[in-house]
């Protein structure tokens, strides 16, 4: 299972990557999550400009087997949706790269410190 060391992780299998400006982050689902979901057929996300609280639902992922909610790992505002997700299988193929879900302005960048690092996430998923 691929768990990049430069990301932070949630118990709900989302990842967060703080960008160079220190206030903007990319959010997506982990390799473990996409593997458990199976073939992803549709991704629905809240619109740009949506203000989210920590753990607030920001969208859903529909797979052949199930539908799963997406939870905001930190509070912030959605700045951009990943347009590539019209081809939802991108999430299965590249969950940490082209398959990111939203770009968001993080309300408090230090809140990422409360999320799991790669070692803790790997332990949680039994890796």
Swiss-Prot record:
Keywords carried by this UniProt record: Lipoyl
Entry keyword Nuclease: no
Assembly information from the UniProt record: The glycine cleavage system is composed of four proteins: P, T, L and H.
Cofactor names: (R)-lipoate
Similarity field: Belongs to the GcvH family.
One of the GO biological process terms: glycine decarboxylation via glycine cleavage system
PTM-bearing positions, type N6-lipoyllysine: 65
Pfam families: GCV_H
Lipoyl-binding domain sequence ranges: 24-105
Keyword Transmembrane helix part of the UniProt annotation: no
Function, in words: The glycine cleavage system catalyzes the degradation of glycine. The H protein shuttles the methylamine group of glycine from the P protein to the T protein.
Cofactor note: Binds 1 lipoyl cofactor covalently.
A GO-annotated cellular component: glycine cleavage complex
Alphabetical list of InterPro entries matching this protein: 2-oxoA_DH_lipoyl-BS, Biotin_lipoyl, GCV_H, GCV_H/Fam206, GCV_H_sub, Single_hybrid_motif
Protein name: Glycine cleavage system H protein
Gene: gcvH
Highest rank taxon of the organism: Bacteria
